[in-house]
Curated annotation (Swiss-Prot):
The gene is Tst. One of its GO terms (molecular function) is sulfurtransferase activity. Keywords: Acetylation, Glycoprotein, Mitochondrion, Phosphoprotein, Repeat, RNA-binding, Transferase. The modification N6-acetyllysine is found at residues 14, 136, 163, 175, 224, 236-237. It holds the Pfam family Rhodanese. Expressed in numerous tissues. This is Thiosulfate sulfurtransferase. Residues 144-159 are annotated as: Hinge.
Length: 297
């Protein structure tokens, strides 16, 4: 089966703790804290500076993105990504482990996992349970900054894992791909607002199916088993044997869909990078669906 040859998308806290204890963090193994929080809530970089997994570097998703785009969190260029992660000591031969400090156990880490994959890097994993469970289990932390020796990372964009506005618009006619939206149900339906969004009504792309990403996580913040993940997709009539595009608001939690499908043996889920924040501003009104007070979004 295909999932038997896929690189492990998850590593356990126990595995990472043992790897750190045995001195494996270095050019062949790098750890990244990819935390990000809504403005006015928590300060990701400050929290990293106060405590983080020993040897971890801070991956600033605000810096490693296309800052010229009017849309949120769009992918950087190949050169930008390669330079950014190279400065974190990551080469094309490095195993990268990503975590974040979100209370859910995982929020932004799957986005960075997907970013590495979309830029051609196979050996990347998410820390299952995140920093939340690293702390809960009593593993070591440090405030000591990580200063890895810079490395060379050649990024090669894998366009099959990325979808553009034009491709999603065309898909409304061709229906070659299933379209799955990972946001909370109220935001998908248009009955709850998009948080911290100015000029962005909630709602969804016509024809998309709602599978909230939090369904993939246990109450303790771990990824559910492949069997449980398959059942979630099946319950929403999402066929993992067929092509699939993941979307959300800004291309972040959509990566949870890509990760969950990967754990079920499906590595080819594409993410619509602009997601709802782009669709709302560019798409024809009849392709935007909302149950909110204004009808169409």
């Amino acid at each position: 089966m295909v999932h038997q040859v896929l690189y492990r998308a998850l590593v356990s806290t126990k595995w990472l703790a043992e790897s750190i204890r045995s001195g494996k963090v270095g050019p062949s193994l790098r750890v990244l804290d990819a935390s990000w929080y809504s403005p006015g809530t928590r300060q990701a970089r400050k929290e990293y500076q106060e405590r983080h997994v020993p040897g971890a570097s801070f991956f600033d998703i605000e810096e490693c993105r296309d800052t010229t785009s009017p849309y949120e969190m769009m992918l950087p260029s190949e050169a930008h990504f390669g330079d950014y992660v190279g400065n974190l000591g990551i080469s094309n031969d490095t195993h990268v482990v990503v975590y974040d400090g979100d209370d859910l156990g995982s929020f932004y880490a799957p986005r960075v996992w997907w970013m590495f994959r979309v830029f051609g890097h196979r050996t990347v994993s998410v820390l299952n349970g995140g920093f939340r469970n690293w702390l809960k289990e009593g593993h070591p932390v440090t405030s000591e900054p990580s200063r890895p020796e810079p490395a060379v990372f050649k990024a090669t964009l894998n366009r099959s894992l990325l979808k553009t506005y034009e491709q999603v618009l065309e898909n409304l006619q061709s229906k070659r791909f299933q379209l799955v939206d990972s946001r909370a149900q109220g935001r998908y339906l248009g009955t709850q607002p998009e948080p911290d969004a100015v000029g962005l009504d909630s709602g969804h792309i016509r024809g998309s199916v709602n599978v909230p990403f939090m369904n993939f996580l246990t109450e303790d913040g771990f990824e559910k088993s492949p069997e449980e993940l398959r059942a979630i997709f099946q319950d929403k009539k999402v066929d993992l044997s067929q092509p699939l595009i993941a979307t959300c608001r800004k291309g972040v939690t959509a990566c949870h869909i890509a990760l969950a499908a990967y754990l079920c043996g499906k590595p080819d889920v594409a993410v619509y990078d602009g997601s709802w924040s782009e669709w709302f501003r560019r798409a024809p009104p009849e392709t935007r669906v909302s149950q909110g007070k204004s009808g169409k979004a």
